């Protein structure tokens, strides 16, 4: 891809290099170049067929193991002429999970398509010396384009001639203000936002008129570079997917190891080969929580609904949990931390500093100047014009001091003068009014106005005014100076009378400081990345609590000097990055991730898209966000507010906590089943049938597991900085201990029950009672999992009404299974009632004992892993 340094070349050089001139290309030459360079559109990633996408859903160890189990079960059922129910149920589970995953993947981003929509428009070009309108996809290097206010720039181009040209480049740079452009020569190296003689594809012309020569099209444009980044970015697994994959791998390896041991032991004992195979299949069914994928999918769907109520729209389901695992939130400034509305905040006039709330008297000339030096139009409550002028217009309107003054002439703002002036008539007298930067205005003033009296401007007075500007600028205010003349108005910008200052800013959202404080208490680092100046970025960051000193801020220029290894260390100490390009933003995200952080990135412009896609969770803006960003993002903020991100993190942490409870609930029971199936092989007795295990895993376990998703947040959820720390595993020491130790104890108890009733009655009765025990245990254990650390034996044990109802329904279904004709598939008939009561009684005793020993677990084992990285 070409390095675009056309801004360093003079127009004449470009004419020669591009073999063109002011009359444009000939139609013949344009056709040749179209064939050489191709259409002016972005390349697209080769798409996979739906069939291939669906097949990829089976590329998982756990799924493969289940398929093998189903196939072997079907073969044995065929040989032994038995029912295929087990095989069919397993395959149905596999297909349902694959279908859900397929639907999710089909929602994948279409960002490149959205970028290409920016090229579906028309532009006016000069060809053969004549103006014509063509499809922008036919534009080639060397074309001369005419641009006017409202036009979409379709290629990177050098300005030949312009008049009051302003371009909004926020899609590329993040700079919210329109940039003034002109045909100037630039010899030194400049950042994208400093290239005043260029216009770029994907940007909008907001004011003025220009002729430009096209230098780059399609993938060679700055927009094309962003498109290339989007195509090159790999869709990495989310934290949740990594954690679930780890569970799959661990379970698969354990199952394979145990099956091998079972086969060896069984063959050494000269057991029937088909019996060994059936036990192996039973083991696979017992070990794999078949319903886990479906349950997690349902939980995440419920989480998506809850987040939507809090103005967070989740596009990619796994991102629900990722948001709760976030370590660092990289936020844009404009519109997210701030309101994205410039507002007048300070007024300096008559030697006094006022706020926008004050009612100020005796300032007619000040009001005349403000009313005159703006070009805002209002249409159906919509304000059109430069954002600073809109802020002034609204201020005048709110104070009811907007004055309609006849205008004779206007001297538009330009980057050399840094001023705009108007000639107006007031009561038959001609005035000139000027608005601009303090440097430019004050150096052209000879007098200042105070209480309708004129005074000579002295050096001391200038120092005083510059001091006021410095103090106000430190508050993130943009300061403009005002002046006027009543004599020699044909030369309006010299020998003027200084009136005062007006300060404007895009203020922080009221909710942001509290939200940032909540993040800090939660161990989440806030990083602000903006296209604005370092001074503005620092001031806003200080005002909302992101940084306390200037040392926490840096610029894109400084970052670009660092190697990747140096940047990896540098990102640990900076919280504010100003004047950041898309490529630098991508490097910052990569550096943060290389330190082991889970990174959330917000953005609204096309320039943000690569970094949003690269981040662990990309957050797009619902109001100001481009369609490109919305397609790339994992979630979208309906109201664009930073505090909404924190609401999303809070909800994500609740869901993460509940998923841990569900993992405990499902795996603890499955490990018990694995141990008992293995023991049954050693004892040469069948404790469980495959159908019983499927019933427990799919029916008894699934509904309570889903209902655990409705557990409410805990009071310390956003204060607990370590328990929610991201690891590639759910298995904290506490969770592992509860699963393993608990499973061993439960297996011993159940083995004793089995042996006792095998002697007291028979093996089949003992197996049936074991089935009843395990079902009862799973229902009681669902209540225990509501709180991993503390006992649930209190008045709140039934406070999760959905869980209570779910358990009650399963209990009813279980009773129906035991007393109707279908019971023959699960238990032997005519079991003595006292056997059942003894079994259930033991289960309740074990449940109570399990709750009583929870404090011992909590004391001995941590609910987090030690982490090395620091925030």
Where are these regions (language model features)?
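A C-terminal functional module that forms or caps the active site or interfaces directly
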Residues: 785
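Conserved cytosolic headpiece of P-type ATPases
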Residues: 1-719, 728-731, 756, 771, ...
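Generic alpha-helical transmembrane segments
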Residues: 700, 704-705, 746, 768-782
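Core segments of transmembrane alpha-helices
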Residues: 669-673, 738-750
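Membrane-helix interface and helix-disruption motif detector
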Residues: 688, 758-765
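Membrane-water interface at loop-to-transmembrane-helix junctions
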Residues: 724-744, 764-769
């Amino acid at each position: 891809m070409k390095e675009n340094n056309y801004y360093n070349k003079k127009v004449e050089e470009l004419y020669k290099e591009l073999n063109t001139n002011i009359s444009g290309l000939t139609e013949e030459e344009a056709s040749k170049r179209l064939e050489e360079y191709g259409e002016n559109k972005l390349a697209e990633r080769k798409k996979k067929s739906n069939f291939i996408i669906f097949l990829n859903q089976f590329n998982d160890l756990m799924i493969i193991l289940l398929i093998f189990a189903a196939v072997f079960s079907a073969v044995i059922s065929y040989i032994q002429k038995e029912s295929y129910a087990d095989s069919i149920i397993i395959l149905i589970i596999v297909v349902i999970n694959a279908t859900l995953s397929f639907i999710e993947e089909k929602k994948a981003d279409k960002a490149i398509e959205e970028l290409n929509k920016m090229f579906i428009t028309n532009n006016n070009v000069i060809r053969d010396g004549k103006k014509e309108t063509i499809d922008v996809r036919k534009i080639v290097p060397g074309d001369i384009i005419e641009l006017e206010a409202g036009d979409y720039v379709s290629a990177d181009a050098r300005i030949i001639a312009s008049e009051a040209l302003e371009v909004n480049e926020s899609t590329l740079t993040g700079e919210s203000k329109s940039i003034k452009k002109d045909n100037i020569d630039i010899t030194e190296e400049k950042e994208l936002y400093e290239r005043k003689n260029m216009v770029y594809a994907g940007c909008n012309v907001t004011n003025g008129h220009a002729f430009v020569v096209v230098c780059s099209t399609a993938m060679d444009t700055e927009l094309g570079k962003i498109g290339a980044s989007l195509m090159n970015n790999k869709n990495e697994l989310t934290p949740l997917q990594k954690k679930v994959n780890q569970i799959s791998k661990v379970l698969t390896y354990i199952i394979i190891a145990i099956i091998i041991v079972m086969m060896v032991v069984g063959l050494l004992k000269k057991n029937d080969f088909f019996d060994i195979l059936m036990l192996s299949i039973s083991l696979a069914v017992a070990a794999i929580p078949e319903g886990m994928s479906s349950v997690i999918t349902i939980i995440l769907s419920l989480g998506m609904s809850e987040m939507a109520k809090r103005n967070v729209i989740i596009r990619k389901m796994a991102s629900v949990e990722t948001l709760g695992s976030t370590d660092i939130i990289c936020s844009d400034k404009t519109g997210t931390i701030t309101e994205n509305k410039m507002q007048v905040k300070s007024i300096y006039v008559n030697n006094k500093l006022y706020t926008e709330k004050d009612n100020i008297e005796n300032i007619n000339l000040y009001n005349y100047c403000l009313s005159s030096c703006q070009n805002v139009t209002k249409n159906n409550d919509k304000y059109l014009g430069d954002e600073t002028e809109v802020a002034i217009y609204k201020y005048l309107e709110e104070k009811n001091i907007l004055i309609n003054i006849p205008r004779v002439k206007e001297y538009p703002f330009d980057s050399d003068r840094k001023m705009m002036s108007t000639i107006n008539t007031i009561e038959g007298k001609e005035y000139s009014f000027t608005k601009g930067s303090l440097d430019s205005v004050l150096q052209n003033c000879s007098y200042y106005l105070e209480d309708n009296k004129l005074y000579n401007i002295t050096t001391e007075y200038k120092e005083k005014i510059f001091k006021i500007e410095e103090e106000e600028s430190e508050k993130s205010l943009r300061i403009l100076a005002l002046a006027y003349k009543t004599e020699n108005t044909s030369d309006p910008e010299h020998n003027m009378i200084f009136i005062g200052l007006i300060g404007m800013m895009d203020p922080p959202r009221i909710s942001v400081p509290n939200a940032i404080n909540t993040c800090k208490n939660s161990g989440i680092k806030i990083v602000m990345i903006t296209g604005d100046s370092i001074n503005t970025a620092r001031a806003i960051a200080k005002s909302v609590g992101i940084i306390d000193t200037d040392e926490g801020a840096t610029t894109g220029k400084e970052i670009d000097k660092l190697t990747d290894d140096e940047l990896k260390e540098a990102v640990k100490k900076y919280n504010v990055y100003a004047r950041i390009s898309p490529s630098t933003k991508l490097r910052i995200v990569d550096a943060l991730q290389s330190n082991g952080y889970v990174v959330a990135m917000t953005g609204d412009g096309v320039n943000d898209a690569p970094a949003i896609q690269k981040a662990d969770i990309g957050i797009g803006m619902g109001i100001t966000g481009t369609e490109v960003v919305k397609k790339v993002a994992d979630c979208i903020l309906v109201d664009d507010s930073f505090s909404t991100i924190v609401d999303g993190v809070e909800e994500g942490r609740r869901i993460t906590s509940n998923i841990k409870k569900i993992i405990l609930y499902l795996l603890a029971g499955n490990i018990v089943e694995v141990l008992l199936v293995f023991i049954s092989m050693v004892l040469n007795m069948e404790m469980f049938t495959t159908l019983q295990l499927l019933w427990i895993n799919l029916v008894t376990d699934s509904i309570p597991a889903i209902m655990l998703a409705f557990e409410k947040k805990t009071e310390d959820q956003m204060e607990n900085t370590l328990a929610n720390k991201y690891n590639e595993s759910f298995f904290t020491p506490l969770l592992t201990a509860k699963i393993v130790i608990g499973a061993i104890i439960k297996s011993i108890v159940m083995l004793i029950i089995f042996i006792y009733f095998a002697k007291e009655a028979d093996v089949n009765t003992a197996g049936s009672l074991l089935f009843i025990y395990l079902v009862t245990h799973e229902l009681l254990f669902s209540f225990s999992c509501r709180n991993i650390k503390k006992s649930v034996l209190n008045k709140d044990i039934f406070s999760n009404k959905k869980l209570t109802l779910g358990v009650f329904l399963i209990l009813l279904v279980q009773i129906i299974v035991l007393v109707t004709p279908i019971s023959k598939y699960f238990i032997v008939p005519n079991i003595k009632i006292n056997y059942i009561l003894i079994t259930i009684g033991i289960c309740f005793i074990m449940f109570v004992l399990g709750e009583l020993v929870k404090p011992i677990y909590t004391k001995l084992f941590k609910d987090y892993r030690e982490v090395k990285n620091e925030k």
